[in-house]
Curated annotation (Swiss-Prot):
Keywords: Cytoplasm, DNA damage, DNA recombination, DNA repair, Endonuclease, Hydrolase, Magnesium, Metal-binding, Nuclease. Belongs to the RecU family. The record marks 99 as: Transition state stabilizer. GO terms for molecular function: endonuclease activity; magnesium ion binding; nucleic acid binding. Mg(2+) binds at residues 82, 84, 97, 116. SUPFAM superfamilies: Restriction endonuclease-like (SSF52980). This is Holliday junction resolvase RecU. Binds 1 Mg(2+) ion per subunit. The gene is recU.
């Protein structure tokens, strides 16, 4: 329909509003992005070499709608992944997992799997530095929890309970978010485990 005198086309306004979808699969992406930016900062300054581990996937079916555009339509995890990140800092092997929750009082232990706990125990046995970064998004607080504290709590009831934030505060270290790096977890490693400053 043309609107005289301006010859504008009137657009229909839909009375149905779009519902906001919550994508639970990507809840931790902003925290993960902050860790990735931190690792990029450490790498660019030659402080540490730490990378996110790729998840091993077996591709089963691929569609080729066009020769230049392959689309994966079916894939499966080939094996259970261990932890999210690994690398080297001052000659020390570093291995850690990152978890995020919206809860204010506890970190759900269902976020941790037995194969991850076993992997962390193996890293500790080889004298590696192993820990978890726990982010409470509602509180805007992040903690560095040594793997041994996580393993000890997990062994109490095979990971069926939630880990209270009081336990995390007592056994871990609060990570102060910054601009560069955003999640300065190497400060905690240096000050509490290696006895110095990473700069």
């Amino acid at each position: 329909m043309v609107n005289y005198p301006h010859n504008l086309i009137r657009q229909k306004v839909s009375s149905v509003q779009k519902q906001n979808k919550v994508d639970f699969a990507n809840r931790g992406m902003s925290f993960e992005a902050a860790i990735n930016a931190t690792n990029d900062y450490y790498l660019s300054r030659q402080i540490a070499v730490i990378h996110k581990k790729p998840t091993p996937v077996q591709i089963v079916k691929v569609d080729y709608p066009k020769r230049s555009r392959a689309k994966i339509v079916e894939a499966y995890f080939r094996q259970a992944s261990t932890t999210d990140y690994c690398g080297v800092y001052k000659g020390h092997y570093v291995d850690f997992e990152a978890k995020e929750t919206r809860q204010k009082t506890a970190m759900p232990m269902k976020n941790f799997h037995l194969h991850q706990i076993e992997h962390m125990a193996c890293v500790l046995h080889q004298k590696g530095i192993c820990f978890v970064l726990l982010h409470f998004s509602t509180l805007k607080e992040t903690y560095y929890l040594p793997a041994q504290a996580l393993i000890s709590f997990y062994q109490i009831d095979n990971g069926s309970k939630s880990m209270p934030i009081d336990y995390i505060r007592k056994n871990g270290f609060k990570v102060a978010f910054g601009a560069f790096p955003q999640v300065p977890y190497l400060n905690i490693i240096e000050q509490n485990f290696l006895g110095g400053d990473y700069n």
